[in-house]
């Protein structure tokens, strides 16, 4: 994928890679784990999207995590996605964060509490030094189930439900 040409960038378009692989874009991204701003979720809810306020989605974020720091009101343990602090701290980044703080930009120790305005080290989806993508966290543990067939190079047209339970997909 590419962005549309933009006249403010001399009509350039920018490559925008997407994860057409098991695990989706979590298999190709920079490993950063960030949920987004609380106020953005609340605006989605205010626009009529029931179930999308910060307080509505927070329990699902907590359930998804296996947070290295431990569980609390914002983080969970025992979930399928391993979330940890970055192992490498770079002096140049520390200097940048100190400079940002000097001009009034706060340091942030946890970008996943709903207010991620500021500067700091992001957490990553990593386990034992390896990427913990959605495929690693969710698919690998169940990939040998007899009732699961993994298909690649397919396009899903529809998720089929019985009552409120997804039971299959229609694809080509």
Where are these regions (language model features)?
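Conserved redox-cofactor binding core of oxidoreductases
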Residues: 45-166, 172
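N-terminal glycine-rich phosphate/pyrophosphate-binding loop and immediately adjacent elements
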Residues: 1-62, 170-171
């Amino acid at each position: 994928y590419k962005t549309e040409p933009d006249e403010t960038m001399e009509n350039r378009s920018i490559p925008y890679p997407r994860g057409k692989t098991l695990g989706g874009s979590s298999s190709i991204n920079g490993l950063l784990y960030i949920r987004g701003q609380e106020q953005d979720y609340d605006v989605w809810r205010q626009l009529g999207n029931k179930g999308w306020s910060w307080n509505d989605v927070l329990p699902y974020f907590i359930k998804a995590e296996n947070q290295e720091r431990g569980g609390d009101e914002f983080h969970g343990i025992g979930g399928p996605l391993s979330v940890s602090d970055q192992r490498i701290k770079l002096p140049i980044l520390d200097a940048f964060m100190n400079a940002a703080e000097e001009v009034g930009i706060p340091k942030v120790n946890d970008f996943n509490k709903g207010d991620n305005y500021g500067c700091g080290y992001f957490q990553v989806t990593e386990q034992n030094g390896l990427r913990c993508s959605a495929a690693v966290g969710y698919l690998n543990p169940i990939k040998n189930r007899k009732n699961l067939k993994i298909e690649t190079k397919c396009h899903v047209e529809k998720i089929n439900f019985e009552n409120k339970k997804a039971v299959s997909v229609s694809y080509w």
